[in-house]
A protein has these predicted regions:
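Radical SAM enzyme [4Fe-4S]-AdoMet core and its adjacent flexible, acidic
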Residues: 1-4, 128-291, 295-301, 305, ...
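Conserved alpha-helical substructure of the radical SAM core
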Residues: 2-132, 343, 364
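Short, intrinsically disordered, charge-biased short linear motifs at domain edges
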Residues: 24-34, 257-264, 311-321
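Flexible mid-to-C-terminal extensions adjoining Fe-S/redox cofactors in radical SAM and related proteins
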Residues: 26, 270, 289-364
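Exposed loop/turn and edge beta-strand positions of beta-sandwich/beta-sheet ligand-binding modules
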Residues: 29, 74, 278, 293, ...
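Residue-level signal for mature regions of secreted extracellular proteins and peptides
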Residues: 32, 36-39, 268, 286, ...
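The −1 position to Zn-ligating cysteines in a subset of zinc-ribbon hairpins
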Residues: 38, 42, 271-274, 287, ...
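Secreted/processed peptides and extracellular or luminal domains of membrane proteins
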Residues: 45, 49-52, 281, 299, ...
């Protein structure tokens, strides 16, 4: 048995044990950090729109204090705002790689600021311990639709320029991976069908196209989620288009399980997979608010209390019980992924059902 396989199995066993219960003083191994609130676009599906472009973002020193308080973090998901607008982006990443042992960083971006993004990434990739940095380019459809939806006539063109830059940078450092992310809504099903083919054919460095289902308090309240039958067919199309690049990709085994879980969650209107938000994952917003997930309100603020004063508070314990009792549900991949992967029963269930769906799809 190879050393890398033993390491992965050991990690999986450790995190599966962690998923059972929260103990005081335990750092969530999967942390979502809104690195800023500043954004240059006006996306209609944004769930964070009420909090954008504020003047109370955490300072570098406040991020440093947070990092020094926290323990080991497996994966850091940085969000915003547009994350690469943050001047100290690379320095903040460095805090978490050095102080918290972060090995993987995922960042969604609108791709508008090519030069800034390259500068920040070159800084981040100076880390000798970082194993993977995934840059996720957000695209809503083909150019005309995407530009109109995001309120900027050059947003698609700028994103493609950033993809080209990332492809060049990846040749220098293969730890950099390039994904695209699209929010599925009732109105952009045809757009995504065409977009996924376009990205596969024109962007050979992109290894994965992810579909997320619209959620939360979107800016345009009229936007609705897709009909599930259409969404299932769209996902089958995306999977077929990208199957040549999914083979061997880190995370490719989990992808069909995520899609299965999202559909079952919507179909049943319940927390179909027992959620481990507040145990395996947590959220820190740009203003210092701390929450267990993006569905529930914040539990406290880092400018008034330390992270663990908030994370281990009576209010936090009560919310963990609510989540455990399945009083909420969502289709957020960032929380579904660890909830599936590090619960053996759920992992087996998702693996079997996702495989059955793949067999059914291949037979139609």
């Amino acid at each position: 048995m190879s050393t890398s396989l033993v390491s992965r199995l050991t990690r999986h066993a450790r995190l599966s044990a962690r998923a059972v219960n929260h103990h005081e003083g335990q750092t969530p191994p999967f942390l979502i950090v809104f690195i800023n609130s500043i954004c240059n676009l006006t996306c209609e599906h944004c769930f964070y729109w009420r909090n954008l472009n504020q003047r109370d973002d955490l300072t570098y020193d406040e991020f440093k204090r947070l990092s020094l308080e926290l323990g080991q973090i497996e994966i850091l998901n940085l969000s915003g705002g547009e994350p690469f607008i943050r001047p100290e982006f690379a320095e903040i990443c460095q805090l978490f790689t050095e102080n918290n042992g972060v090995k993987q960083i995922y960042v969604p971006t609108n791709g508008y600021f090519t030069d800034r993004t390259e500068k920040q990434l070159r800084g981040v990739l100076q880390s000798k311990t970082l194993q993977r940095f995934v840059c996720e380019i957000s695209l809503d459809g083909m150019p005309a639709y995407h530009n109109r939806f995001r309120g900027n006539p050059k947003s698609f063109e700028k994103a493609m320029e950033t993809v080209d830059m990332l492809a060049r940078l990846q040749k220098e450092d293969p730890r950099l991976r390039i994904h695209s992310n699209t929010v599925a809504m009732s109105e952009n099903m045809d757009e995504i069908w065409e977009l996924t083919e376009y990205l596969h054919d024109h962007c050979p460095a992109i290894e994965h196209h992810n579909l997320a289902i619209i959620r939360g308090d979107r800016k345009n309240a009229s936007l609705q989620g897709p009909a599930l039958d259409r969404y299932k067919k769209l996902y089958e199309h995306v999977a077929e288009v990208w199957k040549d690049r999914e083979e061997g990709r880190f995370g490719s085994v989990v992808e069909p399980m995520l899609q299965w879980a999202k559909v079952k969650t919507i179909e049943t209107g319940t927390q179909y997979v027992p959620c481990k938000a507040g145990i395996l994952s947590g959220v820190v917003y740009a203003n210092g608010d701390v929450s267990m997930c993006e569905t529930h309100p914040p539990l406290g603020n880092l400018r008034r209390k330390s992270f663990f004063e908030i994370w281990d508070s009576p209010e936090a314990k009560a919310l963990r019980q609510q989540i455990k009792q399945k009083q909420c549900f969502c289709t957020n991949e960032v929380f579904l992924w660890p909830s599936i992967t590090f619960q053996p029963v759920q992992l087996t269930k998702a693996l079997v059902n996702a495989k059955l769906l793949q067999i059914q799809a291949s037979g139609t």
